[in-house]
A protein has these predicted regions:
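PLP-dependent aminotransferase-like
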Residues: 74-187, 194
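Conserved SAM-binding loop
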Residues: 56, 104, 125, 225, ...
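Structural detector of well-ordered beta-strand residues that form the stable sheet scaffold
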Residues: 55, 103, 124, 182-184, ...
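Short beta-strand-to-turn element immediately C-terminal to the catalytic PLP-Schiff-base lysine
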Residues: 209-210, 223-228, 278
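Conserved PLP-binding active-site segment in aminotransferase class I/II-type PLP enzymes
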Residues: 1-88, 95-97, 166, 296, ...
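PLP-dependent aminotransferase class I/II
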Residues: 38-44, 48-54, 138, 150-154, ...
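Conserved active-site segment immediately N-terminal to the catalytic lysine
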Residues: 179-219, 248, 256-261
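Buried hydrophobic packing segments
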Residues: 63-71, 116, 223, 277
């Protein structure tokens, strides 16, 4: 087998050839803050995915922080219907308070879990399902005491969580206590993923997408928060920019004349990033389709290899395959071998629970312990050509 001279990267930034000019137009316009381009980008995203209650932010992490904040204990002046009709609540919803627990997976980027502690909440780790690397739903159900107020679930690699099973688990909880924990879906890997035929963001939960540099679509940096309810959406728009209502409503100066009823954050996207995001989003279908095509090729041709285990696939779970993960028995030698083949591979994310700042939340996670040393992701993105993906398969088949 002839080695490829150029290294096949695990990640690569996609930038539309028109993005530079569009960003330049904004830079030359004299207005580069949150404005018309942000509004246009949100409409573009909302129309495509079928949920117009989408809010752009400056990062996916900010979107998760905002979602948790929006679920905090209602203030007396809030509309009493703010949580009505939303899948995770009933009229008994108590709201999140400082010190409450959030169930979360440690197998993810730290950007998923740090917003939990930043909101003065406690993390309760849920073990992983080694067949998908998503949260183990049996363990989730075991770890839902009354003080659990939210679940932060990650769609690993873009492969959707079983949202129906999570709904059933939460329904049992609601039967006991009259309300159920909120579900926040971390879709940083899952831009364009579908569950049971519907894009993520349409299952009546908060959902975050990341627009960070190496994701399917980038705005240089940024995030999206899909909201499940009109009033939560309106609050999200306010709180991403200090709580200031940007709608003039007859005022001559909205900054100085508007009363701030609820303090907020500096989480907004600017028009430069939005302009870049819009240009890149025009290529979304082609890019995500290529990720899926390469993944399907691997699914077919990486079967029955000694020491290599493929992850589970189920009908109705349509991954956007930001990464393609598999389990390798002797990972150290696999890493070295793939490096010699000029193929970049990685675990991608370290388990969050072993960081020293997480010491107070330590617990036993047997599935993760057995699996973490085997997790490897191989190049699957839009940049991987037919020739390269064949080469990757050939190399893996000749390992050992």
């Amino acid at each position: 087998m002839v080695l490829m001279k150029e290294t096949i990267p695990l990640f690569k930034v996609f930038m539309s050839p028109t993005a530079k000019d569009k960003a330049g137009e904004v830079l030359d316009s004299g207005y580069i803050g949150q404005g018309a381009k942000v509004d246009e980008f949100e409409k573009q995203i909302g129309n495509y995915f079928g949920n117009n209650k989408v809010v752009t932010t400056n990062a996916g992490t900010s979107a998760l922080h905002l979602a948790l904040h929006l679920l905090k204990k209602p203030k007396p002046h809030w509309n009493e219907d703010v949580f009505q009709g939303v899948a995770f609540v009933s009229h008994h919803w108590p709201g999140i308070e400082d010190g409450d627990e959030v169930l979360a997976t440690p197998l993810t980027c730290t950007a998923s879990n740090w917003p939990i502690v930043a909101n003065n909440l406690k993390i309760k780790w849920v073990d992983i399902d080694p067949t998908t690397l998503n949260m183990c739903l049996k363990d989730l159900e075991k770890k839902m005491p009354r003080k659990t107020k939210a679940i932060l679930g990650v769609h690993w690699g873009g492969y959707p969580l079983d949202l129906d099973k999570i709904r059933d688990i939460r329904s049992k909880f609601r039967g006991k206590y009259g309300w159920a924990p909120a579900l926040i879906e971390d879709g940083a890997h899952a831009f364009g993923s579908k569950y049971k035929g519907k894009y993520l963001g349409n299952h009546n939960n908060f959902v975050m997408n990341s627009l960070q540099a190496i994701k399917h679509i980038t705005s240089v940096d940024g995030g999206l928060l899909y909201c499940p309810h009109d009033e939560l959406y309106e609050r999200a728009k306010l709180l991403r920019w200090y709580g200031i209502d940007r709608n003039p409503k007859g005022r001559t100066d909205f900054r100085c004349e508007a009363d701030i009823e609820e303090w907020g954050f500096k989480f907004h996207m600017n028009d430069v990033c939005a302009a870049i995001g819009m240009e890149n989003f025009k290529h979304m279908d082609r890019l995500v389709s290529r990720h899926k095509e390469n993944a399907a090729y691997y699914d077919l041709r990486l079967q029955n290899i000694e020491g290599v285990t493929l992850l589970k696939r189920e009908k109705g779970f349509e991954s956007a395959f930001w990464i393609y993960s598999l389990l390798v028995d002797d990972r150290a030698s696999f890493y070295e071998y793939m490096k010699e083949c000029n193929i970049m591979v990685s675990q991608v994310h370290e388990r969050n629970d072993k960081h020293s700042c997480m010491a107070e939340f330590q617990t036993k996670l047997p599935n993760l312990e057995k699996t973490i040393g085997k997790v490897v992701s191989i190049p699957v993105g839009w940049w991987v050509s037919d020739e390269q993906r064949k080469y990757i398969v050939d190399c893996i088949r000749k390992w050992k």
